[in-house]
Regions:
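Active-site pocket-lining/capping segments in soluble small-molecule metabolic enzymes
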Residues: 1-87, 101, 106-289
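As written
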Residues: 96-97
Length: 289
């Protein structure tokens, strides 16, 4: 939600009190000018005065500035921060962030490695450092791994988004022959345009009003793996989406979590989830493989 004035924030604060739902304010620019930090700190203090204590930040220097000014608000490290790895957690540990939001480009194994590293460091009882206790991963919408810090594509009405062009990702250590065996016919990443058209002709998964859960990116099949890796929170992207589509996304994600809780195996979960949410097929815009 874009907030245009402080009076709108006050209205939102009253809604938070009424419905008892957490709201995090976002300062998601990749960097701010040093002369802006004082003003941002003042704005954050104003927001804290009406009950907003949690902030998502993408500018590392802003976090350092806030801690230097003794502003002890709750901080979530944004998925647009640039790089998320074990070494990065060491850099930020002294600034005591509460949550790390993993980027779209992070694989599940990379998330697991970072969380395991943090767990090991906590057990080492380095009292002067405070590591994150919450870990968030993308679950629905906006597949593009280059969003935010890594986006170099031209976005305009006249041209399609570069991230919507069929593509595939390749680990640099793999040879071409091994890659072909590992990546062959994996839809969403390396599917050809002709294959995509052929698949679309068989069934149309989009509803009559244009809605399809996870149409621009979906990680629902991986929720069991994310949970096992240590992910505690899921991110559902709503920016630019229709309000009613966003509401349906939320309901579908909640239902998916219920199905996951009732399933004894990952295979059973995926089968039941797809049967209920995607009876005519899904978007094939998968976050992870």
């Amino acid at each position: 939600v874009q907030i245009g004035s402080f009076s709108e924030l006050e209205i939102l604060a009253n809604m938070v009190q009424k419905y008892q739902k957490p709201v995090h304010l976002t300062f998601n620019s990749l960097y701010y000018r040093p002369e802006q930090y004082e003003e941002i700190a003042r704005i954050i203090q104003q927001c804290r005065s009406i009950g907003f204590e949690s902030y998502i930040l993408a500018d590392p220097a802003l976090l350092v500035y806030l801690r230097k000014e003794k502003i002890d608000c709750e901080v979530h490290l944004s998925g647009d921060l640039g790089t998320v790895n074990s070494a990065m957690t060491e850099v930020f540990a002294k600034e005591y962030p509460k949550r790390i939001i993993f980027q779209r480009k992070n694989t599940i194994s990379e998330m697991r490695a970072v969380i395991q590293h943090i767990t090991a460091q906590k057990e080492a009882t380095r009292k002067e450092w405070t590591y994150p206790t919450e870990f968030e991963a993308f679950a629905l919408n906006e597949l593009c791994q280059f969003s935010g810090a890594f986006c170099n594509s031209l976005h305009c009405d006249e041209m399609g988004y570069l991230c919507r062009v069929p593509y595939w990702k390749k680990p640099v250590s793999l040879s071409e022959s091994k890659l072909e065996k590992q990546e062959k016919n994996r839809p969403g990443e390396n599917i050809s345009i002709s294959e995509w058209d052929s698949a679309s002709e068989l069934t149309n998964p989009v509803s009559e009003d244009g809605y399809l859960c996870g149409a621009t990116g979906c990680g629902l099949c991986t929720l069991k793996q994310l949970s096992d890796a240590g992910i505690t929170h899921l991110k559902l992207v709503g920016r630019g989406n229709y309000t009613d589509f966003m509401e349906r996304d939320i309901r579908n994600l909640r239902r998916t979590l219920e199905i996951l809780e009732d399933s004894s195996t990952e295979e059973e979960y995926i089968r039941a989830m797809k049967a209920e949410l995607f009876p005519n097929g899904c978007s094939h815009m998968c976050y992870a493989r």
